[in-house]
Design a protein with these regions (language model features):
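Outer-membrane beta-barrel translocator/receptor signature
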Residues: 146-148, 160, 169-178, 183-252, ...
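Structural signature of Gram-negative outer-membrane beta-barrels, strongest in the C-terminal barrel
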Residues: 275-280, 392, 406-408, 440-599, ...
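Membrane-embedded beta-barrel scaffold of Gram-negative outer-membrane proteins
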Residues: 337-343, 349-365, 537-553, 560, ...
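Gram-negative outer-membrane beta-barrel transporters
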Residues: 57, 400-402, 454-457, 461, ...
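Outer-membrane beta-barrel domain signature, strongest for Gram-negative TonB-dependent receptors
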Residues: 260, 266-402, 408-409, 589-591
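Acidic, small-polar-rich N-terminal luminal/periplasmic segments of exported/outer-membrane proteins
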Residues: 66-204, 578
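C-terminal beta-signal and adjacent terminal beta-strands/loops
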Residues: 600, 699-707, 727-792
Length: 792
């Protein structure tokens, strides 16, 4: 199959299949020899070529024999191809056909099908990802803060959350790995990892054209294809996608003239070119380029309580807002990727994976969401990184080994202007801005190995370790300017930014022996992260496993530093798991995992001082807390008949605070419900004019906090219903899908801001900027969309 390309929205072209293929059979999709099942892909904007055409007669016969039975699902969680049921890791795997049947159109919807998982769009953005698994992640996307959940595209690490809310094309499967992945995947995977596994190009010239129309004037066009330049040897893949949708709401009032008033809209294009070379059966090369540009408007929040500085009422719709900033926003992503793979013999495979990524994101975030400049934050994010990885994977009869060397070099920089214009005017100035600029740059290398040894035909042991050495350099300029300042000239029409640096450097190194900071701060850390596991295969259908693993989130510097404060140590998670993976019958699968972990040296940004007086505030980053959690996860599949299948996923987590030096104090887990539940039903109707697949899905999330130190914004428990129907022609060339999301039009919070004070009686008072800023951002309302595609 053709290689996939990722954009900042997720679409999965449907794979053609015989009418005889069961849902579970299609979901598993064939995964070839390890040499042919892994391909590296660049980070955000990757489009794919068209999927392969109908299976041959033998495949149809095999599929017919498998109807009504569970099928083998293959995963690469341990960087080698193996059965899901034989992999001692808590994994949710969603195949390309299943993505299409459920109508999954964006990465954040994957959270519905994985227990104890949160994947949401970050606050005032359209494409920045907030990810938590088992309560471990990172909410603030500012440069310098490291994620707690790793995002990978065929083993290429996506370092920053900007642009990570991806749409997919022709992905073979998505794997959600729960629990620390510190041995094979390295830093910043204390919660787990999300993997995109894609296909390589094979076969003849293929094209795929797909169009989607839907609610809020959704109109998407995707054209992808592959051309064999030399038969079975050299392939050229190209793709283009244009994704558009009007806003779910609007900016009711914009203080600036000539602004686009769409709120929660979508406007994105992506393109790619890929060259793949197969010189022999044992040797493979690929080079790719991709680019994405997302010009969806900045997202305006919903005021949960009225402003005390304006007379603007709380809007009727949670998707309506007010702003005093420009409404434009941009995310630009561009990247290159390289892959070389050589199968030395039947037991040994060597691989090199390399990538270079660049991203630039100027954006406007109105924290107070009023027509006045009470608390406005225009900001820029500017990142680039290079990665290199060499792998050597050995597979013997009783012994296997995955090993490698990894190098990462990344620069993460930015600039934001916290404009407190109304407060500045009250002080007799034309305005007031706290400007912060800086960089947090990282260079790290790692060596890792994980071996598995079969002690007997039933008992296996696994032992792994990774050593990581990392150096970070950082500088911060931070200070007050008694005027309203924007990042560059013409940020708003007619604005001219003064020349030079407006605020002093406060974080760095004094190299001249005086009080002037003229070099970046430097810190180095190293971590040894082990894993020990034991697996017992009781019989062909049942495996018990237990493991201890460790992961860490990188140490860093405070990107909002106001003084020359030291860096903070890495966060460390020690996790224990026990579980069972069992096929109880040919039609019933049940996987259960119990886990507990200790989370030490939690990095926490605390705000000290008078919240209403920005000149008195001090934000310090500290290792300020230690927590623990325990929980359970259940995933079950029942193939009730040849054409009917049910899937259940349940997650539970119990949280404990063991040490709490945070200011304000820690009170709970952010964006993590105590209970999550999903029930999915899939029915395949076989007709003379093609297959029709009906899908119904119910998803439940318990109540949860938006912030870990405040209960002012929290979401009550809610349930969501999604319905889909997909038709595919007998020949497999035409397909169409009708999808209804959030059928009951539930309103649910996914982010917010709480710059407000509250007295003992529950009355709200002014916070930073002088207003009662309590803002919520919401998930998508009810939508309906129709997709029609043609392959040739």
């Amino acid at each position: 199959m053709s290689q996939s390309i990722l954009t900042n929205s997720l679409v999965s072209p449907y794979q053609p299949h015989s009418a005889a293929v069961s849902t579970e059979k299609r979901k598993s999709a064939s995964v070839k020899h390890p040499m042919h099942s892994l391909c590296a892909l660049a980070v955000a904007s990757v489009l794919s070529t068209a999927p392969a055409f109908a299976q041959d007669g033998q495949a149809n016969a095999d599929a017919e024999a498998q109807k009504g039975k569970l099928e083998r699902i293959e995963v690469t969680a341990r960087k080698t191809v193996e059965s899901l049921q034989e992999t001692p890791v808590a994994i949710t795997s969603i195949g390309a056909v299943e993505l299409g049947e459920k109508g999954i159109s964006v990465l954040t919807e994957v959270q519905q099908f994985s227990p104890n998982t949160t994947l949401q769009t970050s606050r005032g953005t359209n494409s920045t990802l907030t990810a938590f698994i088992r309560g471990l992640g990172q909410q603030d996307p500012l440069w310098g803060y490291e994620p707690g959940v790793g995002i990978y595209v065929d083993d290429v690490y996506i370092a920053r959350p900007q642009g990570a809310v991806l749409d997919l094309l022709d992905v073979q499967r998505i794997e959600v790995l729960r629990g620390p992945q510190g041995t094979l995947y390295g830093k910043n995977t204390i919660g787990g990892a999300v993997k995109y596994v894609t296909k390589e190009m094979t076969g003849d010239t293929q094209m795929n054209v797909e169009a989607t129309v839907g609610s809020y004037s959704q109109r998407d066009i995707k054209v992808t294809g592959q051309i064999p330049l030399i038969e079975d040897t050299v392939y050229l893949g190209v793709g283009y996608a244009n994704l558009n949708r009007d806003g779910f709401g609007e900016y009711l009032v914009s203080a600036l003239p000539n602004q686009d008033k769409e709120n929660y809209n979508k406007d994105l294009w992506a393109a790619r070119v890929t060259l793949e070379v197969h010189p022999s059966e044992d040797l493979f090369f690929r080079i790719g380029w991709d680019k994405t540009e997302d010009t969806s408007n900045a997202k305006g929040g919903y005021r949960l309580i009225p402003s005390i500085l304006t007379d603007a009422p709380v809007p009727d719709s949670v998707f309506d807002s007010y702003t005093s900033l420009p409404t434009w926003n941009k995310v630009e992503l561009e990247g290159y990727n390289w892959l070389a793979r050589y199968r030395v013999n039947d037991d040994l495979e060597l691989k090199y994976i390399g990538s270079h990524r660049e991203s630039y994101s100027p954006t406007n975030i109105d924290f107070d969401n009023t027509p006045l400049p009470i608390f406005d934050v225009p900001a820029e994010y500017d990142d680039n990184n290079d990665t290199h990885e060499i792998q050597a994977n050995y597979t013997g009869n009783a012994f296997s080994l995955v090993s490698g060397l990894y190098f990462y070099d990344g620069e993460s920089c930015g600039n934001f202007d916290a404009i407190l214009g109304v407060l500045g005017q009250s002080l007799g100035a034309s305005g007031l801005t706290r400007e912060v600029t800086g960089c947090n740059n990282s260079e790290s290398w790692a060596a890792y190995a994980q071996m598995n040894y079969d002690v007997t035909d039933k008992l296996s042991l696994s032992l792994g370790a990774r050593y990581t050495d990392e150096e970070k350099t950082a500088f911060v300029n931070n200070g007050l300017v008694f005027a309203n300042v924007y990042p560059y000239t013409d940020w708003i029409d007619g604005y001219v930014r003064p020349d030079g640096q407006l605020v002093p450097q406060v974080l760095g190194t004094d190299t001249d022996g005086d009080e002037v900071l003229d070099a970046p701060a430097v810190e180095s850390w190293s971590r040894f992260t082990p894993r020990v596991g034991v697996e017992y295969q009781m019989d062909r259908d049942t495996m018990f496993f237990a493991s201890y693993s460790q992961g860490f989130k990188s140490g860093t510097f405070n990107p909002r530093a106001q003084t020359n404060e030291p860096g903070v140590e890495p966060e460390v998670v020690d996790s224990f798991e026990v579980g069972v993976k069992s096929d109880l019958t040919d039609a019933l699968r049940m996987n259960i995992t119990l886990f507990s972990y200790d989370h030490k040296d939690r990095q926490y940004i605390g705000v000290e001082g008078d919240l209403s007086d920005p000149t008195a505030l001090d934000q310090r980053l500290r290792n300020a807390a230690e927590t623990a959690a325990k929980g359970a996860e259940l995933e079950m599949t029942w193939v009730a008949t040849d054409n009917l299948q049910f899937d259940v996923a349940y997650g539970y987590i119990d949280f404990e605070i063991k040490k709490n030096n945070a200011i304000p104090p820690l009170i709970g887990l952010a964006s993590t419900p105590e209970n999550t539940f999903n029930l999915n039903a899939n029915y395949l109707l076989e007709t003379s004019f093609g297959d029709i697949t009906f899908n119904a899905n119910y998803y439940y999330r318990d109540d949860y906090l938006i912030f870990e130190t405040s209960d002012l914004i929290q979401q009550d428990a809610y349930g969501m219903v999604n319905l889909s129907a997909r038709w595919e022609s007998v020949e497999g060339d035409w397909y169409a899908g009708l999808h209804v999301k959030n059928l009951t039009d539930e309103e649910y919070l996914v982010g917010g801001y709480d710059f407000v004070t509250q007295d003992d009686d529950g009355n709200f008072g002014p916070g930073l900027g002088g207003d009662t800023t309590l803002i919520g951002y919401y998930g998508d309302p009810r939508t309906v969309h129709l997709t029609v595609g043609y392959r040739f």
